[in-house]
């Protein structure tokens, strides 16, 4: 554990900070409750089942996500007037989910669930998106599909994104800035041209050198 997921949990408010501050767009949110942050932060987890409700249909899951910014009351969650909009969103993913609105999410494949979780996390306006190793539990082919769809959504929405990954190729190919952490500290921070000049061998060399210095 280098502290990557702990850092994400601090940002999202899942755990409290012992020291320091969490500042988003110049606003100190350190003391803000997790449910309040959730309205402005989208998060996709490593486990495909973590970002969706398996016993609810695709339609019901999307309806819940659609209300995230507004909050939940005692009114009907699923609005028939939004079905066509949901179907259109899903059709753009190319996975056939637009024909599965009435299907229980628990019966979908891991890749379909992860893409649905990604779409749900970005349906409403958010300050930024957090991806917590969201392709790690998928087979290589599905991981590539999910990663390309992720890049498509992030670019279309011009969305600031923090992605934790052990896939160095993904980090180099998709990231604008690369941070490497070890024992809770940032040991590498590259952006712009410095980042563009990096390759996987160099990053592995840095990692191995740090491991040796720490006695591993």
Where are these regions (language model features)?
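ABC ATPase NBD coupling module
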Residues: 28-42, 50, 72-75, 79, ...
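ABC ATPase C-loop
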Residues: 121-122
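Q-loop/switch helix immediately C-terminal to the Walker
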Residues: 56-71
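Catalytic Walker B motif of ABC-type/P-loop ATPase nucleotide-binding domains
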Residues: 129-132
């Amino acid at each position: 554990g280098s502290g990557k997921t702990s850092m994400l949990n601090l940002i999202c408010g899942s755990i409290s900070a012992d020291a320091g501050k969490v500042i988003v767009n110049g606003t100190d949110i350190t003391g803000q409750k997790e449910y309040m942050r959730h309205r402005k932060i989208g998060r996709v987890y490593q486990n495909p089942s973590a970002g969706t409700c398996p016993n609810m249909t695709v339609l019901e899951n999307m309806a819940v996500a659609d209300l995230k910014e507004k909050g939940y009351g005692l009114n009907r969650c699923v609005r028939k007037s939004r079905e066509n909009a949901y179907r259109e969103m899903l059709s753009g993913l190319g996975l056939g989910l637009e024909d599965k609105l009435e299907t229980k999410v628990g019966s979908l494949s891991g890749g379909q669930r992860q893409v649905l979780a990604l779409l749900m996390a970005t349906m409403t306006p958010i300050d930024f998106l957090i991806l917590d190793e969201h392709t790690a539990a998928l087979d290589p082919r599905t991981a590539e599909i999910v990663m390309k769809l992720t890049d498509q959504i992030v670019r279309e929405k011009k969305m600031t994104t923090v992605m934790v990954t052990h896939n160095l190729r993904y980090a180099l190919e998709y990231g604008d800035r690369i941070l490497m952490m070890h024992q809770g500290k940032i040991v590498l921070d590259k952006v712009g041209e410095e980042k563009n000049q990096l390759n996987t061998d160099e990053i592995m060399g840095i990692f191995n050198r740090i491991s040796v210095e720490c006695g591993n």
